[in-house]
Each structure stands twice: as structure tokens, then as C-alpha cells.
Swiss-Prot record:
It comes from the Bacteria. Part of the phosphoribosylformylglycinamidine synthase complex involved in the purines biosynthetic pathway. Catalyzes the ATP-dependent conversion of formylglycinamide ribonucleotide (FGAR) and glutamine to yield formylglycinamidine ribonucleotide (FGAM) and glutamate. The FGAM synthase complex is composed of three subunits. PurQ produces an ammonia molecule by converting glutamine to glutamate. PurL transfers the ammonia molecule to FGAR to form FGAM in an ATP-dependent manner. It comes from Limosilactobacillus reuteri (strain DSM 20016) (Lactobacillus reuteri). Pathway: Purine metabolism; IMP biosynthesis via de novo pathway; 5-amino-1-(5-phospho-D-ribosyl)imidazole from N(2)-formyl-N(1)-(5-phospho-D-ribosyl)glycinamide: step 1/2. This is Phosphoribosylformylglycinamidine synthase subunit PurL. Mg(2+) 2 binds at D121, D274. Mg(2+) 1 binds at E97, N539.
Length: 742
């Protein structure tokens, strides 16, 4: 087929500039890697594979700061997902991915295909997905466009996950004006497997087959990788052709077929990989690179649902529900029979070749002949300029903001109605959290918890991130993101194992934004080392801007923890009247970036103060010990809204109350957001032993009561509020806002 442009026309007209390939990169490819002008198809492949979304060419130097190994890690970054040993020959597999740009443009399909893509990463490793999580960040709900995007994003996540029969058991949803023009949709999936079934995305063995399985290839999602590597503007906000369209029913069949092959016929399979960003070119080139092999593909054999597709379109399509397999020669028909059983296509489209060349044929002609390494290993890493933002320099010279609170009841009630704090059940009730009946704790708890059938073990999982803290103080904010995730895991009675992440930032060519990325990753990395929670997978999503307005830097931490005895799962809500109430951790005047500051001033400002990361980790480990020894009745970590909001949340959906004595604390401290704190309830007969373990880090502040009242005594006031009244405010806030009219 005739190419859309000749190599000479490409050199002259430079269409690659619209595909996120720079002129310097193009010149390097033609002079240093190929020694000739690349043709149209080849230029398109380089544009996709050298995009930030696929290559991490800007962020890779920063990503090297992360630890990625410890005694439990079986597979770290580089494969479809990370794998962690959970004893007894079993492993947990997990990863998070962003689908921010597609979801901003087309919320329903963008969110749905984000779920589908991350599920394929999990089962491509040989694991069965057992849970989904999300991290969603929207503009304010007083905007009709935001309300539409919230509704459709949540519906997309729910529809895809529910059709797959995989519970969505945890997540977070926040609202801030910075996400108005560029929402964040981060999806996480967790899978369970036997360690013997771990797969790799590799293609090796001369003569072995390259097999395409799953849905047909269409024109949806072409250049989705480069779309995700550019800022939004008025022109590309309507670029719906870069958004994929999902079919969860086909994905369910694909999952079962792949696991059938992996578990029952592992000797037929060399490697397997999802066709995600950049479609066939990404999966095939990465597998060939991993196997140090050459590869030859005949694109005429690729199943296509639209006529007249060019080689360029076939290779860069991001049609969903597709996988690429490397199958041992002679077993092609055996593999085909498995996929036939599930009514799925399985076609041999190429072979592994000697050498290291990547060769494509289309319409009987050779349309690509380049080294495999030129697509995967020879990408030019970019040195980015960094500059500390002037706003931070200025804030460091200003006095800290301390709120003046006259009516503590009014402030607490107003905070409970803030969108980020308010009850999200009207959103997550659209997700099936109980399917497969392994869910012990679902949405609304500090972490989602699943039992592992046939064992006494359980898995706890969470997603956490706070862009406000990172915006004000990137390094400390990065630490807080990790500490908040660990706090949610430990509050459930689980030992943190490892993390995945989504690094959501603006344009990295802006020196201030790259400085934010660097500093926050440094903070996260320091916290990962302290907590021994390596980064085993994840992704980077840059260029989250709209017409030059960047989001707050928002690293999302997805963490999984191991519960040794599922009977010792710790609930988030108070359990027994008469139990002692403890505040674990120190409270300071930490209001910069808090929900209280945003509510009272309409903005955020100041510096997020550093804290003793090692000390926080030490007492969190001691707290976990008390849980494992059966000393704790309930636990809830403190986050948005501080102690006041957390106290209310522990008695919501119960018929109990709290009597709290904070006579040594001024009123504002009730809403401080000092990290690493917990509300813990303990039976009176276990209180002495609990205090002996926690020492000065546990502060007795009250007791659980039979009355449905929240009573708090403060140095300069009192709070006496009916819990049912507070709960009504908390529950009705988001439904009322979603129904409002502009």
C-alpha cells in the first residue's frame, strides 16, 4: 500500500512534530540509528514508542530514585505488573495505571477502558484479578460539566468492573478547581496467583509463533500514547478518536482463555503481553526486546474490523481486549483450539527471527525494517531543567496560617459537607463490591479487605494521594502520600508489603513542574525505604494541563498489605460502649493545605511542615503489633478534616457515641491534619497492655458511649452534637450537589 507521505516529504513537512516526536529525535533516528530517512509507518512507530507515555524519557532519571526490591518482591517494574510473595507458594500481583486524558475527553469510555487495560496487565502475568480500586480527582461539583464527568466516569468504572465480575472494594475521590479542565482517573487492579504460574512479556526462540488473540483491530485509539503525552488545549479536547472503546464481555472471555492456557498448558507458551498503549507495536517490540530477538510480522493477517486500514493504523490502533502471545512452534493449533472454545480469534501473525530486526509486511510489501532496540532501548533520555517555584520561596518567609474558630459545631458540620470529605456511597454504590463473596471490608472502610480462600490470610488494599500537600511542599507531600496509604493498611490490621503508583503532573518542560516531580518522588522514595515498601509497578502521567493551567502535582500511592489472620481484621467503626478511645500520634498546628484552610479561605497556602518519618513508622509498627495480639477493637486513620471529622466517621452508621476530653487542646487542633495519626478503641481490660506497647504515642482521650452523641471538651469550647444530624449532613452533601442546576 502506498505510504501517506514519502520519506522526503516527512523530512520536509515534519508531521512527526504533531505526534510528540521532536526534530532532534527525528534527526537522531535517521542519522544515528537508521542511516536513512524513515518512512511514514516507521516514523509513526517511533513517535509512539518514543512518547513520554511509553518511554518515560523525561521521568526515567527521577524514577531511578525509587527502591524496587526487598525480600518479598518476585517481579518489579518492567513487566505487566509487579508480583509479591505472600507465603504458601502464593503471590499477589498489582499495578495502577492512569487514563486521565481519555477520561477527560470521553468520561464513560475513558474510565471503562482504563479498568479494562489494568485488568489485562494483571492476567497477562498469570494472575486472576480479584479486586479493583480507583483514585479519581475532579473539579468542584458546583460546575455542571464536572457533575456530568463525575456521573459518567463512575458509570464507566462500574459497568466494566461489574460485567467482569470483579469487585471494586476501595478508592478515593477528591474535588478541587485545579482538576476542572483535566480530571484524573487512576485505576488499580489486584490479582492472586500461584508463584509457579508467573509469566513474562517476552518473545524468544527462532521460528516460534507470534499470535494475536482477542478482539479485532479498528481505528479507535490511534496515537493514544502520544495523545497522553501532550497538554490539553481547545483543539485536542475534542480528539475522541484517540479514546478507545471497551467490551467487558469479550474481556471476560479473554481472561478465562488466557488463564486456561497459562495454568493448563504452560509448556506451549513463551510469553504473553497486553496490547495497551501504542497497540501492536508496543507489545511486539517490547516482547522482542525482552527476549533479545528479532521479529517479523505480516499485518495482512491481523484481524481487522474496518476495511482499508494502513500499516500505520494497524500498528498504532489501541483497540481494546487484545493480547499478543509468543507460542512454541508446533503448538499454534493447540492454542487456537483453546481460544476457539471461548469464541475468540487466535491468529498467527508472525515469527521470531534470528538477529535483532523488527520487520513488518503489509499488502505484500515490506513497510518497516528497523532494529528492535531503536524502538525500545535507544530512546534519548532528556535532561530537564528544574526550578523551585517562587510561590514556595515566598511561603517559606510567611507566618503559618492559624484558624480562628468561634463555633466548632458549625465548622465540623460544614467540613462534613465538603465534597472531598462527604460520604461517597452515592458514587461507589454503583460498583459491585461483594461479587465473589470474598470481601471482608469494602468501600467506606480505611482499606478494602479480601479473604484468601483456603487460608487464614487476607489482603488489604488502598489508594491515596493529596495534591494540595504536594503543591505546597513537594518532598513532604510525597512522604505524606506514602504514610497515608500505610496508615490505611495498618488501620485494617495488615502489614504493608509494597506499592504501585501513578505520578500525575503537568508539563515537565516547565522547570517548576519538573522540580515538583523530582522533589515529591524523593519524598516518596525516602518513605518507601523507611516502611520497606518498594515500588513494584506504576506509571507516569505528565502533561495534565488545560490551556496552560496545570493540575496540582498528584502522586497516587496504591498499597497492598498482608493480614496474617483474617479473623483479626480491624473495623473502622467503634464497636463496644465503654471501650477506651486513644489518639495515636502527636497533633501539631498543621493547617497548610488542609480542608479547613480551603473551606475558610477559599484557597490553600503556606508550607507543609516536615515530620519525623522514622518515629511515625516505629509507632505504626507497634500499633500493628497490638492489633495482631488482639488488643484493638477498632481503628481509623486521620486524614482530611483531621480529628474532628475522624471522630464523627467512627460513629456514623452505628448507634454509639463518643465522649472525648481534649481540654488541653485549642479548638482549631480538632481540624489539624498532622500525618500518621489514628483513633483507636480498646476494651478497658486490655487498655494497660495497649498503653505499655504504645507508650507516649498513645493518648487516652475518652470513651465510647451508648448515647448517639459526639461530645468533645476543648480548652476554649465544647462540641455536643447529635450523630444522626451530623451523619445526615455528611450523607446528603454529594447527592444534593449532583442534582443541583446551574
Amino acid at each position: 500500500m502506498k505510504q501517506a507521505m514519502t520519506p522526503e516529504e516527512i523530512k520536509e513537512k515534519k508531521p512527526y512534530l504533531d505526534w510528540s516526536l521532536t526534530e532532534a529525535e527525528y534527526d537522531y533516528i535517521r542519522t544515528q540509528l537508521l542511516g536513512r530517512l524513515p518512512n511514514y509507518t516507521e516514523t509513526g512507530l517511533f513517535s509512539a514508542m518514543w512518547s513520554e507515555h511509553c518511554s518515560y524519557k523525561k521521568s526515567k532519571p527521577v524514577l531511578r530514585l525509587f527502591p524496587n526490591k526487598n525480600e518479598r518482591v518476585l517481579q518489579g517494574p518492567g513487566e505487566g505488573a509487579g508480583v509479591v510473595d505472600i507465603d504458601d507458594g502464593q503471590a499477589v500481583v498489582f499495578k495502577a495505571e492512569s487514563h486521565n486524558h481519555p477520561t477527560t475527553v470521553e468520561p464513560y469510555q475513558g474510565a471503562a477502558t482504563g479498568v479494562g487495560g489494568i485488568l489485562r496487565d494483571i492476567f497477562s502475568m498469570g494472575a486472576r484479578p480479584i479486586a479493583s480500586l480507583d483514585s479519581l480527582h475532579f473539579g468542584e461539583l458546583d460546575n455542571s460539566t464536572t457533575r456530568m464527568k463525575v456521573t459518567n466516569t463512575v458509570r464507566g468504572i462500574g459497568d466494566y468492573g461489574n460485567c467482569m465480575g470483579i469487585p471494586t472494594i476501595a478508592g478515593e475521590t477528591t474535588f478541587d478547581p485545579c482538576y476542572q479542565g483535566n480530571i484524573l482517573c487512576n485505576a488499580m487492579s489486584v490479582g492472586l496467583m500461584d508463584q509457579k504460574d508467573i509469566q513474562q512479556g517476552r518473545a524468544a526462540g527462532i521460528g516460534n509463533a507470534v499470535m494475536y488473540v482477542g478482539a479485532k483491530t479498528g481505528r479507535d485509539g490511534i496515537h493514544g500514547a502520544t495523545f497522553a503525552s501532550a497538554d490539553f488545549n481547545d483543539e485536542n479536547m475534542t480528539q475522541r478518536s484517540a479514546v478507545q472503546v471497551g467490551n467487558p464481555f469479550m474481556e471476560k472471555l479473554l481472561l478465562e482463555a488466557c488463564l486456561d492456557l497459562i495454568r493448563n498448558h504452560p509448556d506451549w507458551l513463551v510469553g504473553i503481553q497486553d496490547m495497551g498503549a501504542a497497540g501492536i507495536v508496543s507489545s511486539s517490540a517490547e516482547m522482542a526486546s525482552e527476549g533479545q530477538s528479532g521479529m517479523e510480522l505480516n499485518l495482512d493477517l491481523v484481524p481487522q474490523r474496518e476495511p482499508g486500514m494502513s500499516a500505520y493504523e494497524i500498528m498504532l490502533s489501541e483497540s481494546q481486549e487484545r493480547m499478543l502471545l509468543c507460542v512454541k512452534k508446533g503448538h499454534e493449533e493447540d492454542v487456537k483450539k483453546i481460544f476457539d472454545f471461548y469464541d475468540l480469534e487466535a491468529v498467527t501473525i508472525g515469527r521470531i527471527t534470528a538477529g535483532h530486526d523488527y520487520v513488518l509486511f503489509h499488502d505484500g510489501e515490506e513497510v518497516c525494517h528497523i532494529p528492535v532496540s531503536s524502538l525500545t532501548d535507544d530512546v534519548l533520555e532528556e535532561e530537564s531543567l528544574e526550578k523551585k517555584p517562587a510561590r514556595i520561596e515566598l511561603a517559606e518567609q510567611q507566618p503559618a496560617w492559624i484558624p480562628d474558630i468561634d463555633n466548632v459545631a458549625e465548622v465540623l458540620t460544614a467540613l462534613l459537607a465538603q465534597s472531598t470529605i462527604a460520604d461517597k456511597s452515592s458514587l461507589y454504590q454503583q460498583y459491585d463490591s461483594q461479587v465473589r463473596t470474598n470481601t471482608v471490608a469494602g468501600p467506606g472502610s480505611d482499606a478494602g479487605v479480601l479473604r484468601i480462600r483456603g487460608t487464614h490470610k487476607g489482603l488489604a488494599m488502598t489508594t491515596d494521594g493529596n495534591g494540595r500537600f504536594v503543591y505546597l511542599s513537594p518532598e513532604v507531600g510525597g512522604q505524606i502520600a506514602l504514610v497515608e496509604a500505610a496508615a490505611n493498611i495498618i488501620a485494617s490490621g495488615a502489614e504493608p508489603l509494597a506499592i504501585t503508583d501513578c505520578l500525575n503532573y503537568g508539563d515537565p518542560t516547565d522547570p517548576e513542574i519538573f522540580w515538583e516531580l523530582h522533589q515529591s518522588v524523593q519524598g516518596m522514595a525516602d518513605a518507601c525505604r523507611e516502611f520497606n515498601t518498594p515500588v513494584i509497578s506504576g506509571n507516569v502521567s505528565l502533561y495534565n494541563e488545560n490551556n496552560g493551567q496545570a493540575i496540582h502535582p498528584t502522586p497516587m500511592v496504591g498499597m497492598v498489605g498482608l493480614i496474617k489472620n483474617i479473623d483479626r481484621v480491624i473495623p473502622s467503626f467503634v464497636q463496644h460502649p465503654g471501650d477506651k478511645v486513644y489518639l495515636v500520634g502527636q497533633t501539631r498546628d498543621d493547617y497548610a493545605g488542609s480542608e479547613l484552610q480551603k473551606m475558610m479561605t477559599g484557597d490553600i497556602s503556606g508550607i507543609v511542615e516536615s515530620f519525623d518519618l522514622h518515629h511515625v513508622h516505629q509507632y505504626m509498627q507497634r500499633l500493628l503489633t497490638t492489633m495482631e495480639n488482639g488488643l484493638v477493637s477498632s481503628a481509623h486513620d486521620l486524614s482530611e478534616g483531621g480529628l474532628g471529622v475522624a471522630l464523627a466517621e467512627t460513629v456514623f452508621k452505628t448507634d454509639l457515641g463518643l465522649k472525648i476530653d481534649l481540654a488541653d487542646q485549642h479548638t482549631a487542633r480538632l481540624f489539624s491534619e498532622t500525618p500518621g495519626r489514628f483513633i483507636v478503641t480498646v476494651a478497658p481490660e486490655k487498655a494497660t497492655e495497649f498503653e505499655q506497647v504504645l507508650g507516649k504515642d498513645a493518648h487516652l482521650i475518652g470513651e465510647v458511649t451508648n448515647s448517639h452523641w459526639l461530645m468533645v471538651k476543648l480548652a476554649n469550647g465544647e462540641l455536643n452534637e447529635n450523630v444522626a444530624k451530623l451523619q445526615e449532613t455528611w450523607e446528603e452533601a454529594i447527592p444534593c450537589q449532583l442534582k443541583s442546576k446551574d
